[in-house]
Curated annotation (Swiss-Prot):
A Pfam family reported for this protein in Swiss-Prot or TrEMBL: Rgp1
Region (Disordered): 247-266, 272-291, 442-502
Note: Restores G1 arrest under starvation conditions to sat1- mutant.
Protein's GO biological process: positive regulation of TORC2 signaling; retrograde transport, endosome to Golgi
PANTHER family documented for this protein: REDUCED GROWTH PHENOTYPE 1 RGP1, YEAST -RELATED (PTHR12507)
InterPro entries reported for this sequence: Rgp1 (IPR014848)
Protein name in UniProt: Protein sat1
GO CC annotation, single: Golgi membrane
Biased composition (Basic and acidic residues): 463-494
Length: 550
């Protein structure tokens, strides 16, 4: 372990792919009463994938795993550090145990440090180690801050922790001290989400057959290897606080660019007032602006083409927010959503209009499933959906004698975002289930009767009183229930069965009458979920101590 503390500060809780990842890395000497000498400090971003061998053919990624390990060995050879001790000793064992408990990993060389991963980890993103500082001396209580800025590739797989697959990303900071030859690596988890424009309204599999899919979505069979150097700058604590804005909230990109242009303009005016020639001052100002424009074009030209293609695909199939639920050629209700995309922590408003008089209860729930392309999955689509299905929020309402109903649900913060890669994806659905009483006379008459005539011929209140009377008098025999169960057990496009006091369905509709002949109609509506971006408060000032290594 090192004698200094390592902390990392981020302006936001998530980083979008295709944008710049920016953070402040701070080294502080708080443990030693003497000067601490750090020979080498470096930083790198690692992204790894973990697969479940029960649901995914892991053997398809063996070559990817070997290639990623080879790239780690190639990209981690900054310096060669001799091993601490080649022989086994109790002290080395205790040091390793203590290091694992405190979230640090020790290795003799940088190559060994890069290979200290789990065996089933498959690399998806590797960046070259960027040197933060060399031969740094920290006196007791002194701190050193470095600003790191790197562009995250647009085709980076987002961070996700699921059942069939997991994607994890971390900022790895390595420290080599003079008192200890072992290289210590600190890992800070970072969350990468899909780009705002990288969400076309197409289900998984549609883009996999597209010729442009290799340019749009992450191909996990080919890990991303970034060899470009990141922007490293040593900054003071005060400058770091200013860059992150007041109370640790970082200024936006536009505000920072506007502030830079304002300072350049003030310097240019000052040079003119001091008597310098207009040509020299103006030429320098114009050349600098032209160089910055050229650099921006080179960096963002390729990403802009990809985003433009994504927008083109998105405009072809916009998602609907108005649906009609039908059964046997009759509209049971109309469902309205406030919008087709929701952010985590946002309220989802749902309205039901024109409910059928026979509908007794409505159940709605937000759920997510993991999708795997057929080439690498072990089970079929139904088995994979059952194994990976998660319910995030639900609501049940009684709608007896109601024509309209409004409901709201809050999308939990821990709900993952909707995303897609060429091999995997996560989709979200709003599952709606209607519990509808069965009327034999009405079934024989046909579905063309309007609502008002149905109420006149057999009012809902009289039907309800008749059912209560039948239950109280006990005239519902087992033979009648068995006969109705046989008739209601047939499925004709919907999930149809008998509803009783103990309903064994997955939806678990409750508060129904004791016994009555009924059917359940289910439907799933596709929606999209996005992660909410939260600006970190108090950043490098006051109470926040920064992100600690895991």
């Amino acid at each position: 372990m090192t004698e200094c503390d390592v902390q990392m500060y981020m302006p936001v809780n998530v980083v979008q792919s295709g944008t710049d990842f920016e953070c402040i890395v701070k080294f502080t000497n708080l443990r030693s009463s003497e000067d601490v000498n750090l020979l080498l400090c470096y930083a790198s971003i690692h992204g790894e994938m973990y697969l479940d061998y029960v649901l995914v053919r892991v053997t398809e990624f063996d070559e990817v795993q070997r290639q990623g390990l080879l790239n780690k060995r190639t990209m981690s050879g900054l310096v060669h550090i001799p091993k601490v001790s080649s022989s086994y000793s109790v002290i080395n064992t205790l040091n390793g145990m203590i290091g694992n408990l405190f979230g640090v990993k020790q290795a003799s060389t940088l190559t060994e440090a890069s290979e200290q991963k789990q065996e089933n980890a498959i690399p998806v993103l590797l960046t070259r180690p960027d040197i933060l500082g060399v031969d740094i001396t920290l006196s007791p209580g002194e701190e050193k801050c470095f600003r790191l800025k790197r562009r995250i590739p647009l085709r980076t797989a987002p961070t996700y922790k699921g059942l069939a697959f997991r994607f994890q990303h971390a900022l790895v900071i390595g420290v080599q001290s003079a008192t200890n030859n072992a290289c210590v690596e600190h890992e800070f988890e970072i969350t990468i989400v899909p780009n705002v424009q990288q969400q076309p309204e197409l289900p998984l599999g549609k883009n996999s057959g597209n010729r442009q899919s290799s340019k749009l979505f992450a191909d996990l069979s080919k890990p991303i290897i970034e060899t470009d150097a990141a922007e490293i700058e040593e900054v003071s604590a005060e400058k770091a606080r200013r860059q992150f804005g007041k109370n640790g909230i970082r200024l936006s990109q536009d505000a920072q660019e506007e502030e830079k242009q304002k300072k350049k303009y003030e310097q240019h005016i000052k040079k003119l007032l001091d008597g310098e020639s207009n040509e020299e001052g103006g030429g320098e100002f114009q050349d600098h602006g032209m160089r910055s424009e050229i650099n921006e074009e080179v960096l963002e030209e390729e990403d802009e083409e990809k985003i433009a293609l994504l927008k083109k695909l998105e405009s072809k199939q916009p998602m609907a927010t108005r649906f009609e639920i039908t059964s046997k050629q009759k509209v049971l209700c109309r469902l309205l959503l406030s919008k087709s995309r929701y952010r985590t922590g946002e309220m989802m408003m749902i309205e039901l209009e024109g409910l059928d008089a026979m509908v007794r209860q409505v159940h709605m729930q937000l759920e997510s499933v993991e999708r795997i392309v057929p080439d690498i999955r072990i089970r079929n689509s139904v088995g994979t959906e059952r194994a990976t299905r998660k319910v995030w929020c639900r609501i049940t309402r009684g709608v007896f004698e109601l024509e309209n109903m409004s409901a709201s649900m809050v999308v939990p913060e821990e709900c993952p975002e909707t995303f897609e890669t060429q091999q995997f994806g996560v989709e979200h659905f709003l599952r709606v289930e209607l519990l509808r009483a069965v009327n034999k006379k009405r079934e024989m008459q046909g579905p063309a009767h309007p609502r008002y005539s149905e109420e006149v011929q057999s009012p809902s209140r009289s039907r309800y009183s008749e059912e209560v009377q039948r239950v109280s008098e006990g005239r519902l025999s087992e033979e009648v229930s068995k006969e109705e169960e046989k008739k209601g057990g047939r499925e004709s496009g919907q999930h149809k069965r008998m509803a009783s006091l103990t309903n064994s369905r997955e939806m678990q509709i409750q508060h129904a009458p004791t016994t009555f002949a009924a059917e359940t109609i289910q439907c799933v509506l596709p929606i999209r979920i996005e992660k909410r971006v939260v600006w970190m408060e108090d950043g490098m000032e006051g109470g926040m101590e920064g992100m600690q290594p895991v």
